[in-house]
Amino acid sequence: MTMRRILGAVAVGVAALAVGGSARAQFGFGQNKIQYRGFDWQVLRGDHVDLYHYPEADELARVTLAYAEESYRVLEQRLAHAVPRRIPFIVYASHADFEQTNILPFVPPEGLLGVTEFAKRRVALPFRGNYAEFRHTIRHELVHVFQLSLGEEMSLRYPKLRMWSLPLWWTEGLAEYLSAGEDTRDEMILRDLTLSGRLPTLGELTWWYGGVVYPMGGAIQRFLAETYGEWRVLQMYRERWKYDDFERAFAAIYGRSLERVSEEWQHWMRQRYYPVVTEGRPLAITAVKVADLAIKPVAWRAPEDSASEVFYFSPTRGYAEIHARRVSHGGAGRSRTVVKGERNEQFESFHFFSSRLDVSHDGVVAFSSRYFDRDALFLWSVAENAVQGRYQFEGIVSILSPSWAPDGRSVVFSGLSITGYSDLYRVWFPDGRLERLTRDRYEDLDPTFSPDGRTVAFSSDRTAFGSEGGRNLFRLDVATGAVEHLTYGNWSDETPRWSRDDGRIYFTSDRDGTFQIYAVDSGGTGRQLTRTINGAFDPQWIPEERGVLFGGFADLSYGVYVARPDADTTLAPVQLAAERLPPEWSWAELDAEPAAATADPYRKKFSLDFAAGDVAVAPGIGSAQGAVFLFSDMIGDHLLYFGLSSYQSRSSSVLENVNGTLFYLNQSRRMNWGVGAFRVKGTFYELDLSTPYNESSWGGFTQLRYPLSRYQRIEAEFRLERSRREDLFPSQSGGLQREAWLASNYLSYVKDNTLWLMTGPIDGVRYTLTGGLTNDLSHGRFDSWSAWGDLRRYLRTGLRSALALRLIGYMAGGERPRQVNLGGTWFLRGYPRYYYVVGTRAWLANLEWRFPLTDFLTIGFPFGAARFPGVQGAMFVDLGRVWTPTTSDRGALGATGFGFRFPLAAPLVLRLDMGWRFRTGDWSRYGLPQQSRTSRFVDFFFGFNY
């Protein structure tokens, strides 16, 4: 390629991004974010915060604004900093609504309780019915706003070419520390890490990611504040510009090296948690493990059976599933899969960290799952191994922990309304009639029927300690609706389940600082049944085992256990309920000024999110320059893209070769649509990258994207353009010139339900089918047509290993059929990327076995050691054939070998493949260069793993 053409390619590259939508449609995968309903956005304004909400979340928005302003004042004082710009808060009444947000480019996972976005400093968060959790998240995210503001202030005051990043444990740990600190679940994780000897050093923790970093970071910040003073936090942000990296800055500000402070922190943690060993015993000693990687167990015994079968959620295969196994005399049988989840729209999510299962006496499993826009209650027949019923309810977006009535005619569950409030509901079968049992702002969870069906016990934050996260057990009289305390105290009593055998309620409580199992009778007299140093949840009494089935946490993993109370674990009876109780708490923020504020309608206003530009100069030949700009509104529903470039040579002016693209995308509804206009001029290449042509064109286009479900969608593009084209090699493309109006249409069907590791997909299936047609309107003929199919299947062979299969087919025709190239490291390894393995007909098969080689990889650089995620190995076989109508006698080309996959930033990988070429039939018609005719080859690749 000449330098002139290189400059031309730089100039038109920006414009090609927009007009190349057909290529994106052919090769694009990914799951869908669906806007099931439109939101009528409104804005409440405080002193520092702009609160964006919709009418269903109006009351919640006022609570959010009041507490955000209160938190701002607290953080302003503690961090001695004022954020100079207004802070946008976008609040959603449920996580189901939050999953539709366009502020993030991906679907927020259920564990994501809030996010602070960098470009606009926006905070977005959902309400899940838990007031204390919500307040914690508000302050946590506001800490991130202050962190970004402090960083921006220092960057403006002391600009540097390179600014290093603070480690995740520092930033998230500070947000946790300044929010509320560790709760009992955080303590459970920290205790487990400390007692198991897995506590990392601060240097090692720098390379850790995931949820476990949050409590560890919070504990580190607490230790640093208590030992060295909280004032050093602000010093870190204001003086970090002086130092080359975090370790040097830390040593200067704290007066000791990171390694020394790491030893001090680990000793502090051991002093904190080692004494608990004298007060309890691990689950490995006190209980029998029934299942690994399992949570939310429930036991069911068929009338004719002497042993129970335990049902539970398990992600052992990557996807969440419902499993079952028999339990008899303390032992467990083989696991079987009952319901497969997270593969289709019917069982999109089981909410297995927050929702329980239940089984009726005749073997019908009741559970909830996300089904399109909201949750559904599913009834699964064990005998028939099929769905027996599915129920959705208007106005209820979330369904948690369904529980059967003793007579099997109804189910009670915890439901979250579209306004964000959590209440108890009862559904009657078979007609699905819904009855509301509670109606207030409190979070009511995990209901369970008494053996006579007259009373429902549940866990709720309606206790006097609820605003700070406390939960107690309550009982509801089904006939009268009266609610009264069953337990009382400043702790968390959770997951009650009423035993139909002894009439007791078995539940979990953290009243001694660790989640233990208790039992309480209808009079409120209880007994502690476990004293473990780990954690125990979701108990159920199994009479034939004379023990308790429960979920436990140990070795950083959840499992299912059975324990028999004995003299060591059964303690003296404890009176759990109080005679006189203080009144329930209320949302104090509703008494504040924001409660009476007037909301203004949201007005769409674009602001700049991203801008970039570049210049290329070839002395004596010419120059090229270009820039791109991306704008969006505050909610992220509307995007505006603008690109401009030009190419100037000795024989042309800047204005003569101006290229531009303007594109608007509307993501506010289920049907995403975009319109754009373009003008391009320069040298281009067909899909084979070996057929060059000069073209000057202008026109407009429309793009449509309609998700059928989270896993399936239809994409379409329509383009009308005025084109003047000159083929540089007319024998390859059908003619010397073309000047005409062209209408192009592309339609694609895409499915993707894959699971990913850092190095690429490991389970599931993804495929796309695309058809395209370009009409020459000026001459009344088909300019070109094409059809493309790409199927990829991933079969897991282990927790981190899989077989990856890819099948590709391509066909094109018309006056100027587009050729495809299947050579190179992305398709057919060991063969040239350009010019040779091209044609208008093609098929390709890839088979690769991927397996882990190392968990982590540390590389030493002159500036220090860097630790990266583990290396993956691979063994592969490729086989493909590409031809045209005039070269139909070509044989197939193949390659086999092994390689290594090195993850950088997911999904980008470095890939090194070494192998051997082989061929079938007549391969000489490809005209391969000499270096591609030898047997051995080495391929190096940077990009995405198929």
Model segments located where?
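Juxtacatalytic substrate-recognition/specificity segment
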Residues: 26-167, 184-186, 203-206, 249
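A flexible loop/linker signature enriched in serine peptidases of the S9 family
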Residues: 290-292, 313-324, 341-354, 366-378, ...
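Transmembrane beta-strands of outer-membrane beta-barrel pores
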Residues: 462, 619, 633, 644-650, ...
